[in-house]
Regions:
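Accessory nucleic-acid engagement/destabilization modules that flank
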Residues: 1-195
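Conserved helicase motor
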Residues: 9-12, 268, 289-304, 452-455, ...
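C-terminal helicase lobe and adjacent C-terminal extensions/tails of nucleic-acid helicase motors
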Residues: 88, 377, 435-442, 450, ...
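Walker A/P-loop
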Residues: 226-249
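Conserved Walker A/P-loop ATP-binding site and its immediately adjacent core
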Residues: 258-282, 289-294, 393
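Conserved strand-helix element at the start of the C-terminal RecA-like helicase core
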Residues: 260-271, 440-465
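Inter-Walker segment of RecA-like/P-loop motor cores
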Residues: 283-335
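Interdomain hinge/linker at the junction between the two RecA-like core domains of SF2 helicases
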Residues: 389-442
């Protein structure tokens, strides 16, 4: 059959064309393959065949020749709507502008909701009748309840927009877009298995290594033979859970024929360290580190310049065998509505997902986060592992969303492991004046101090001897943090003076070993994380390796930590020893009681889909705005320091690639709005269209203390 010559795209140089039919067919092939792991291949193909039928219109053909803008998405959405494919209608309507709110039957044709767009007049597109739509029925579970339908809609949307982007990219570039790069999962499993055997067969292992090997053996065994589902890995800090959890993940992915491993960590500040460890073992080509905060706002694809289109495509798609990302990126993407953030979602299906430091999952959003994890396990062929030294009390929430899911603990005897791996003694120092406390720190040749505020860290650092003192906060770019941590480890190894004042970024996955540590008032989980940086290798007795809990006269407890501090105080009154599974369980139960039942979904994310918002059904756009794990959204500032200078020039040139953004990630700092605005007002920033900026006044950045917290007339002031 001869197909219509109606065009979907014209190449940049004007010499090549792609017909609408060919674009629909290519997109359908890709979308179907993306949805196959969760049994929705026909639905994704159905959506893809409809998504651009509006391009058959005379109005759109005129647009390709420079005519006025035209809405080409609504036509396909209306075709899905009349066929009662609600999820497809959402996906097609939003495949450029983002998933819309559902709205209500009373909405007008001019409203941006799906109800409104279902009534919107569109230009005739009769030529689309050459398309034969495939038979399609969504999986029964996808329509079982509003939460499942909303999640399925986002996953379907992800398959559609990623397929659309890739087919368009392939045509524009004149060659197939590279996909699925990297080594086979089974081959990566073999690499990690070989390394594991070297650890297990080492001669004369230390007592700590013996226990780490116990954990590793359990991970290898469960990974290879355990069923797909929900697991916990409860291991004290310093128990080797990073490598052991990776070993579990690759064994399990190979056994269950899953596509990838996704490692979700709490802080962007340690992505570089975790990715470096994995890359050194598996090869850089197999590990994708999701560094960048940049999000490219979606607009009508046909209105983008070639440079803007390349920039949009540079956002990460998570198509590597091993992905390292943050909890913020992971969960915000799952509740996003923009194509730039959602196109990766289908690649979460068919994965092993490791949640490192699971106790840091955001309390105010805990219910929607657990609901999403439950959906992935139940319907999207994924396995989740909650990996932590301080296992939070999440079982009641999992019972609520997935009663048949029963967490399986990987560690054979967690209580025994905690007893054997106890390497520190916890003491409460009480309250001290800041000046007296700084003097106390200065008298330690080697010491770690973790505080709650960056300003406090700066002040204490300023009071320490210059030689061998360090200040670690998220105001430092990853490149400088890495350099400082290398210096710190070397000085500790050589027995040289090494005094470190840090914010909590050092508590998650940073491998350092101090003889003594201090932790400003906090929750039990944070206290034990700091303890994991003291006598980590067990070379000293626990009685001489003290971790002090303290308060400063001049510093009030941050509002967000007050319930955690109260829960720790309660636990300390009822337990003689705080570093045991029993004490940890008591702490999290008390914390849950203090927060109350509504705190786990403080912003009503789940209710928005269950009941709507002020009559608006399925409010995808509103929820995406509300679901912000970092309430005061951070902005990315790129730093022209070191290798970052040349990278910033490449960014200015407009030739943006994934590789460039990945490299720039370690020369960037995320800062909050007030700090960003002050730098901008001082003329220190070159603003970019995506909301990020390049620092133009390098005096506002110090390799020792990071980006200025305050500025006056363009001069950085460090506190």
């Amino acid at each position: 059959m001869e197909h219509s010559t109606r065009l979907a795209h014209i190449s940049e140089d004007g010499t090549r064309t792609q017909t609408v039919y060919d674009h629909l067919a290519g997109t359908a092939r890709l979308a179907g393959s993306f949805a196959a792991p969760f049994g929705a291949q026909s639905e994704a193909e159905f959506a893809a065949w409809l998504h651009d039928v509006g391009k058959y219109s005379d109005a759109f053909q005129l647009r390709l020749k420079g005519g006025p803008k035209v809405d080409h998405s609504t036509a396909g959405a209306q075709e899905a709507w009349v066929r009662q494919h609600l999820h497809t209608a959402f996906a097609v309507a939003g495949h450029h502008s983002g998933l819309p709110d559902g709205g209500s039957p009373a909405d007008d044709p001019g409203d941006a909701t799906l109800f409104g767009r279902s009534k919107k007049p569109v230009a005739p597109y009769d030529g689309w009748q050459e398309v034969t739509l495939p038979a399609s029925t969504p999986p029964a579970w996808a329509c079982a309840d509003p939460l499942s339908l909303a999640f399925f809609t986002r996953m379907l949307y992800s398959c559609l927009v990623d397929a659309d982007f890739i087919d368009t990219e392939t045509f524009m570039d004149g060659k197939a877009a590279p996909r699925g790069s990297g080594t086979d999962i089974a081959a990566l499993r073999d690499i990690v298995s070989a390394q594991a055997q070297r650890y297990l067969s080492a001669e004369s292992p230390s007592p700590v290594s013996v226990q780490r090997n116990t954990v590793l053996r359990a991970c290898l065994e469960k990974g290879a033979h355990g069923p797909q589902g929900l697991y916990t890995l409860t291991v004290p800090t310093g128990g080797g859970k990073t490598f052991a959890s990776l070993a579990f993940a690759l064994e399990h992915a190979a056994a269950q024929k899953m596509k990838r491993v996704i490692y979700v960590i709490p802080y962007m500040s340690i992505i570089d360290q975790t990715a470096a460890v994995f890359s050194g073992l598996l090869g850089v080509e197999n590990v994708l580190a999701d560094f960048s905060n940049a999000e490219y706002k979606t607009v009508e694809q046909d209105d983008l310049t070639p440079a803007q289109y390349r920039q949009m495509l540079a956002s990460e798609n998570w198509d590597a065998p091993v992905v390292v990302t943050t909890a913020v990126q992971f969960f915000e993407s799952l509740y996003a509505n923009r194509s730039s953030r959602c196109r990766k979602l289908h690649n979460i299906a068919d994965s092993v997902i490791i949640f490192d430091e699971a106790q840091t999952l955001p309390g105010d959003y805990l219910a929607p986060c657990v609901s999403a994890i439950a959906q992935l396990i139940q319907h999207y062929h994924s396995t989740a592992v909650l990996c932590t030294a301080t296992q939070p009390a999440l079982e009641p929430l999992f019972r609520r969303f997935a009663p048949e899911l029963h967490p399986q603990e990987i560690t054979p005897d967690a209580a025994r492991l905690y007893e054997v791996l106890r390497r520190t003694t916890l003491q409460d120092l009480g309250t001290l004046p800041q000046e007296e406390f700084a003097f106390r720190l200065a008298n330690h040749p080697q010491v770690l101090c973790v505080v709650n505020r960056r300003k406090t860290a700066q002040q204490l650092y300023a009071a320490l001897p210059a030689e061998g003192s360090y200040c670690l906060t998220t105001l430092l770019c990853a490149a400088d943090r890495r350099r400082q941590l290398d210096d710190i480890r070397q000085r500790l190894k050589e027995g040289l003076p090494c005094r470190v004042v840090s914010t909590s970024l050092i508590e998650a996955g940073v491998d350092v070993d101090f003889p003594v540590a201090y932790r400003e008032q906090c929750g039990l989980d944070s206290l034990l994380q700091t303890a994991g940086r003291c006598n980590r290798e067990g070379r000293r007795g626990a009685e001489e390796s003290i971790v002090y809990r303290f308060r400063l006269d001049e510093c009030s407890t941050p509002q967000m930590l007050r319930q955690n501090v109260s829960a720790l105080d309660y636990t300390a009154r009822h337990q003689d020893t705080l570093d045991t599974p029993r004490a940890i369980q008591l702490y999290f139960n008390e914390l849950s009681d203090l927060r109350g039942p509504d705190a786990v979904d403080k912003h009503g994310i789940l209710d928005a889909f269950l009941r709507g918002i002020r009559g608006c059904q399925f409010p995808f756009a509103q929820v995406a705005e509300e679901f912000r794990l970092i309430e005061n959204a951070a902005r990315t500032v790129y730093l022209p320091v070191g290798e970052g200078a040349a990278l910033c020039e490449q960014l200015r040139s407009g030739h943006v690639t994934r590789t460039l953004l990945r490299k720039l990630g370690i020369y960037s700092v995320s800062c909050y709005k007030d700090q960003f605005d002050k730098l901008d007002a001082a003329g220190a920033l070159e603003l970019r269209p995506d909301g990020s900026a390049i620092l133009t006044d390098t005096s506002c950045y110090s390799e020792k203390t990071g980006l200025a917290m305050d500025v006056e007339t363009g001069i950085g002031l460090y506190f």
